[in-house]
């Protein structure tokens, strides 16, 4: 029975891995965006973490996960002589890589961490049925990589500590690599392994060789990571230059995050946010069951004494010191806590668990900013389909320039636009984020040309004659359907505003959770607007009355 359940959950994980939801900008801009430009020559816009004077992100742990698959994909296409892989193929290839890493490494680690066979099956199924495993863990997050590194770090700590007669040299080397990769991936990594790592002290005391190997290889991998990062950020630097004047990204990251003024730019939260808000959001009914187990028993429950629980709770406590606290920072806690907690057979819990994860799975795995990636992939085709001449020929087609305004969405990844080698097209993407509607309208007023300039109208209009063949400048607006401010430009009375929006494309599976204005509209009206008007639209902006 458990095998059939696990296989079914595996198919569910595949479905969500290939669903283009968008959980946080970091999943694109701190990984794929970086390497797509260098490996596949796609347009890319690097975030400040990689462009500041003191960069805080390392490429050392990212290269094998993102650059290597992209490089292999490019090599495969070159060998077949079929050009460059499309952004869509590259995007879903990376999702497939993350799925495989989750399926193989995460599930394997859980199997290793749970000692009793009957508990292993329940733990693996429980972790596999979590919406966090379906969504966050199959997306290109550094937090997802951190989960794999933390779980395997605990596996190796257990293996090394359990060896009484041998030095476990190979395990120490691998643990050194995992430790260095974890620290260079995210500076939060040591918080999860610091307390469990104390188990190694007796072994290191009995077997000094293990300690020597761990430290020596740790230094080697650290130097390697520093050299790779330094030469990435300063390509002209030699190995000696990198050693003399190194760029140590984890140190830069730590110095940045210890300043409250820097964290305030990203949002400050109360110190109890992780324990009282983020963990319940990630664990749902399992969190309630864990609290009840503490309440109902006078002694400390056995699950609370496990290595997984110690790692998760000590890590959460250490991360709670910092005032910037997002749920994704606790992704490693989910498999750790679910694998150590022993649930009694309860129909109420099973029903609540299924409802919670199905609801959050579809919300976060399908609808959450779900239109950004498909629309960005479709933008070149949308523009080309609406600018070709009536004979649909690419010959003598003037070069097209398009300004695309993204409003009330997450930042669109530039690399998903691809090379546009099949159509003479220049795309200027502008991220307006969540600016007020009046400011967005002012931006449109400045960009949309008057009727006399013969711009902003697609070439397929029946009135587009030979004298208007030079219409090559277009302004598009991409915004959620729930943005009611745009209704004044899309209705029949749009002419009174001087601008009108003509719908060109719509992607229905999109919900903007950052547009919940409960204070102004009220709860029910807000939910009706955001969930009732699902979808992400692409509009052509032009002057009203232009034919």
From Swiss-Prot:
Q: How does it sit in the membrane?
A: Multi-pass membrane protein
Q: Which GO terms describe its cellular component?
A: endoplasmic reticulum membrane
Q: Where in the cell is it found?
A: Endoplasmic reticulum membrane
Entry EC no(s): 2.4.1.-
Q: Which cysteines are joined by disulfide bonds?
A: none
GO biological process terms on file:
GPI anchor biosynthetic process
The alphabetized UniProt keywords are:
Endoplasmic reticulum, Glycoprotein, Glycosyltransferase, GPI-anchor biosynthesis, Membrane, Transferase, Transmembrane, Transmembrane helix
**What pathway is this protein said to act in by its record?**
Glycolipid biosynthesis; glycosylphosphatidylinositol-anchor biosynthesis
Q: Show the GO MF annotations.
A: alpha-1,2-mannosyltransferase activity
Q: Which residues are glycosylated?
A: 391, 419
What is the annotated role of this protein in its UniProt record? Answer: Alpha-1,2-mannosyltransferase involved in glycosylphosphatidylinositol-anchor biosynthesis. Transfers a fourth mannose to trimannosyl-GPIs during GPI precursor assembly. The presence of a fourth mannose in GPI is essential in fungi.
PANTHER family per the UniProt record, alphabetical: GLYCOSYLTRANSFERASE, GPI MANNOSYLTRANSFERASE 4
Q: Provide the family line.
A: Belongs to the glycosyltransferase 22 family. PIGZ subfamily.
Protein name as it appears in the record: GPI mannosyltransferase 4
In its UniProt entry, the species of origin is given as: Aspergillus fumigatus (strain ATCC MYA-4609 / CBS 101355 / FGSC A1100 / Af293)
* Taxonomic lineage: Eukaryota, Fungi, Dikarya, Ascomycota, Pezizomycotina
């Amino acid at each position: 029975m458990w095998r059939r359940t696990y296989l079914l959950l595996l198919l569910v994980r595949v479905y969500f891995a290939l669903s283009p939801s968008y959980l946080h900008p970091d999943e694109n801009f701190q990984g794929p965006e970086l390497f797509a430009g260098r490996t596949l020559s796609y347009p890319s816009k690097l975030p400040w973490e990689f462009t500041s004077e003191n960069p805080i992100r390392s490429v050392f742990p990212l290269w094998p996960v993102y650059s290597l698959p992209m490089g292999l994909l490019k090599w495969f296409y070159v060998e077949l002589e079929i050009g460059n892989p499309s952004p869509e193929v590259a995007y879903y290839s990376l999702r497939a890589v993350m799925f495989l890493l989750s399926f193989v490494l995460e599930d394997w680690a859980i199997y290793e961490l749970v000692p009793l066979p009957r508990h292993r099956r329940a733990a693996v199924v429980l972790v596999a049925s979590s919406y966090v495993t379906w969504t966050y863990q199959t997306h290109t997050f550094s937090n997802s990589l951190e989960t794999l590194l933390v779980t395997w770090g605990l596996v190796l700590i257990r293996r090394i500590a359990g060896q009484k007669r041998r030095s476990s040299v190979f395990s120490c080397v691998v643990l050194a690599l995992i430790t260095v990769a974890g620290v260079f991936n995210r500076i939060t990594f040591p918080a999860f392994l610091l307390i469990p790592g104390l188990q190694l002290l007796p072994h290191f005391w009995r077997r000094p060789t293990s300690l020597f190997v761990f430290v020596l290889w740790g230094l080697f991998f650290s130097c390697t990571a520093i050299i790779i990062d330094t030469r990435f950020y300063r390509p002209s630097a030699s190995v000696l230059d990198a050693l003399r004047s190194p760029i140590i990204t984890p140190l830069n990251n730590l110095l940045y995050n210890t300043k409250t003024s820097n964290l305030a730019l990203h949002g400050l939260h109360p110190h109890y946010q992780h324990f009282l808000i983020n963990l319940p959001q990630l664990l749902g009914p399992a969190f309630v069951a864990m609290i009840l187990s503490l309440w109902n028993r006078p002694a400390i429950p056995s699950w609370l004494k496990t290595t997984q629980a110690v790692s998760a709770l000590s890590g959460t406590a250490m991360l709670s010191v910092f005032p910037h606290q997002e749920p994704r920072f606790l992704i490693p806690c989910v498999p750790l806590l679910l694998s150590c907690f022993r649930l009694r057979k309860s129909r109420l819990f099973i029903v609540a668990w299924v409802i919670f994860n199905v609801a959050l799975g579809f919300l976060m795995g399908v609808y959450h900013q779900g239109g950004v990636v498909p629309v960005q992939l479709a933008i070149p085709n949308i523009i080309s389909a609406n600018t070709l001449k009536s004979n649909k020929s690419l010959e003598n087609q003037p070069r097209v320039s398009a300004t695309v305004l993204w409003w009330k969405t997450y930042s669109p990844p530039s690399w998903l636009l691809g090379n546009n080698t099949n159509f003479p097209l220049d795309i200027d993407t502008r991220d307006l984020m969540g600016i007020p509607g009046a400011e967005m309208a002012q931006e449109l007023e400045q960009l949309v040309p008057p009727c006399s300039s013969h711009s902003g109208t697609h070439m397929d209009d029946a009135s587009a004659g030979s004298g208007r063949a030079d219409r090559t400048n277009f302004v598009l607006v991409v915004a959620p359907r729930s943005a009611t401010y745009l209704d004044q430009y899309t209705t029949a009375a749009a002419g009174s505003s001087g601008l009108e929006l003509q719908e060109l494309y719509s992607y229905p599976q999109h919900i903007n959770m950052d547009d919940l204005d409960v204070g102004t509209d009220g709860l029910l009206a807000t939910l009706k607007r955001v969930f009732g008007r699902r979808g992400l639209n692409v509009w052509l902006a032009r002057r009203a009355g232009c034919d």
